[in-house]
Amino acid sequence: MAIKSRIRTIPDYPKKGIMFRDITTLLKDPVGFRLVIDQLSQHYIENGVDFDMIVGMEARGFIIGGALSYTLGKGFVPIRKPGKLPGEVVDQEYQLEYGTDKVEMHIDALEKGSRVLLVDDLLATGGTAMAGASLVEKVGGVIAEMAFIVNLPDIGGQKKLEEKGYKLFCLTEFEGE
């Protein structure tokens, strides 16, 4: 059974007309979760993508990024919602469908020039990933690649990120569905 088949689709959530891709069904399935981590690990081992640190977006990026950090022997840095990190932070505001949000990272989380794998569960508009990349770059890091379980290419995030020069790796996608 493939990764895609383990992801539940919830129609009309969080609002009418949206097909919500719920990865919690994938994460609770021990074989499915192992497939995710094994396939991501294999990609980075086989393709020799050079990076020093894994940065995960709150909240599901923590789950994937933490497991991937363990399997690949890399450190892990969380990007969090405002007010969740003690100490000095940098922040980045980004656009939501109706308004804005903000994410934060410790100012000393990365050494200057660190190459980073940015990890999140799903790529839709690209706003969260762009905010994460901006934080990494603000503290002197470089995005080596971005990894996602799911890509929703029709929403435009993939195109936006690639136009900015970011390399992406996605395990599966839901196109026009």
From Swiss-Prot:
Gene3D superfamilies: 3.40.50.2020. PROSITE patterns: PUR_PYR_PR_TRANSFER. Pathway: Purine metabolism; AMP biosynthesis via salvage pathway; AMP from adenine: step 1/1. Keywords: Cytoplasm, Glycosyltransferase, Purine salvage, Transferase. One of its GO terms (biological process) is AMP salvage. Signal peptide: none annotated. One of its GO terms (molecular function) is AMP binding. It is found in: Cytoplasm. Pfam families: Pribosyltran. InterPro entries: Ade_phspho_trans, PRibTrfase_dom, PRTase-like, UPRTase/APRTase. Its main location: cytoplasm. It catalyses: AMP + diphosphate = 5-phospho-alpha-D-ribose 1-diphosphate + adenine. Its EC number is 2.4.2.7. GO terms for cellular component: cytoplasm. Belongs to the purine/pyrimidine phosphoribosyltransferase family. PANTHER family: ADENINE PHOSPHORIBOSYLTRANSFERASE. Catalyzes a salvage reaction resulting in the formation of AMP, that is energically less costly than de novo synthesis. Homodimer. This is Adenine phosphoribosyltransferase.
